[in-house]
């Protein structure tokens, strides 16, 4: 080390000749390549510990009790679909809205299709939530809208399963390379789930800054306690992706699942609610 340091110090060139004895030493200790054969671009790892470090906040989620959702629906979490195709008369709209039980959202969606109507994604009902979603990606609201459609019509609720369906549908019309090599849809969903876990709410302006929540203490079905924290962001995001699902909230409470007229146009709203798997 002293020989190398002296040679570097004395040279004014970027390339320095290896001092006598250095090559022999490297051969003796069987070091033949000084360049790391890995994608890890770090030089070394350091952990800092301090008694002055501030306390950090954690949320508790337990499969043994009530599992509070990551996103608790609400009217601000409604996404709007414009009814296009056939123009329905008022009696037809009334017939559609009266179809099935109150929570038979899929039944009313299918009836619209049978009668020649098309539900085309339009917008997020709440402007604050729209902006929050656009912080993930400008096209992310459309992706969520298609995931909601798949949940209701195909009965898929797990986030990982919904993403597999979305990769086949490709609602954003992106290139296959982005879908499969870059895992675009998985990446965007993980970003969103992390934002929800760390404080994003539909009706509160989100600027990308995390709240006081630093992670989850998760109690599994056997009573084991697992810790997920934003310091290990990839592990946390993977956990959320595998263990999250879309849920159905109350149609009456959150005002969705029916054709509603706005400025002469009919819209059909779907509600976004996301929770953790109970099993």
Positions of the model-derived regions?
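Short, positively charged
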Residues: 1-41, 47-279
């Amino acid at each position: 080390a002293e020989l190398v340091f002296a040679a570097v110090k004395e040279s004014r060139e970027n390339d320095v000749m290896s001092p006598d004895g250095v090559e022999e030493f490297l051969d003796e200790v069987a070091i033949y390549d000084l360049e790391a054969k890995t994608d890890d671009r770090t030089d070394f790892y350091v952990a800092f510990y301090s008694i002055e470090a501030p306390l950090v906040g954690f949320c508790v989620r337990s499969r043994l009790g009530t599992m509070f959702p990551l996103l608790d629906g609400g009217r601000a979490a409604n996404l709007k679909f414009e009814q296009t195709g056939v123009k329905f008369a008022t009696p037809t709209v009334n017939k559609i809205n009266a179809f099935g039980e109150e929570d038979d959202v899929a039944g009313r969606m299918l009836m619209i299709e049978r009668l020649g109507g098309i539900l085309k994604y339009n917008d997020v009902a709440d402007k604050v939530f729209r902006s929050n979603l656009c912080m993930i990606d400008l096209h992310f609201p459309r992706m969520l809208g298609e995931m909601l459609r798949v949940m209701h019509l195909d009965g898929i609720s797990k986030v990982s399963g919904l993403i597999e369906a979305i990769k086949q549908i490709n609602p954003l019309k992106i290139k296959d390379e982005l879908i499969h090599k870059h895992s675009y849809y998985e990446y965007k969903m993980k970003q969103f789930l992390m934002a929800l876990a760390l404080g994003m709410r539909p009706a509160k302006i989100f600027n990308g800054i995390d709240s006081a929540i630093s992670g989850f203490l998760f109690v599994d079905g056997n009573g084991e306690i697992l810790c997920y924290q934003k310091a290990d962001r990839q592990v946390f995001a993977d956990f959320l992706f595998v263990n999250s699902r879309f849920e159905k909230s109350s149609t009456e409470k959150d005002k969705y699942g029916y054709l509603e007229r706005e400025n002469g146009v009919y819209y059909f709203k779907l509600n976004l609610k996301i929770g953790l798997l109970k099993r």
